Amino acid sequence: MANAVLVVRIKGQADCPYWASTTMDLLKLERKYRAVILPAKDNLLGMLKKVQHYVAWVDLDTELAQELIDKKARKSGYKKVTPEDLKELGYASSAELAAALTEGKTMLSKLKPLKPWFALAPPRHGFKRSTKRLYGQKGILGRNKELATIVRNMI
């Protein structure tokens, strides 16, 4: 099992029960198509199981993490993250930060000037499977092995 997971909120706020929206707020997934990188701990995986009908997640690899940091990472004021910002945080490059996130050594919410989430666009060419069903039932929700390619289309 990987040390970190990439979680993407697929469904919006309409008809979302209070317990699910509260759980997703705790995971920093307040809006549709937001993505977060979380360490694969039992309590966080339990939260993902609880809201699996609203989010999709996949084990994170370093290349995807670096691509997200380079293209979609933002700091306060919604400004792009520069290499100087990464040096202030103690990382020489985005590859080093991506490796630390993938290994579960740090979280984006602990790196203060950075936003704890990535704002993604809807996927180019749409979803190939249903957004209303779990992955095992020909959908995309829950633990999804193909989510990495979908996220690359959303960047």
Swiss-Prot record:
Range of residues in the leader sequence: none
One cellular component term from this protein's GO annotations in UniProt: cytosolic large ribosomal subunit
Transmembrane segments: none
CDD domains: Ribosomal_L7_archeal_euk
InterPro entries linked to this entry: Ribo_uL30_ferredoxin-like_sf, Ribosomal_uL30, Ribosomal_uL30_arc, Ribosomal_uL30_euk_arc, Ribosomal_uL30_ferredoxin-like
Gene Ontology molecular functions: RNA binding; structural constituent of ribosome
Family statement drawn from the similarity comment of this UniProt entry: Belongs to the universal ribosomal protein uL30 family.
Name the UniProt record assigns to this protein: Large ribosomal subunit protein uL30
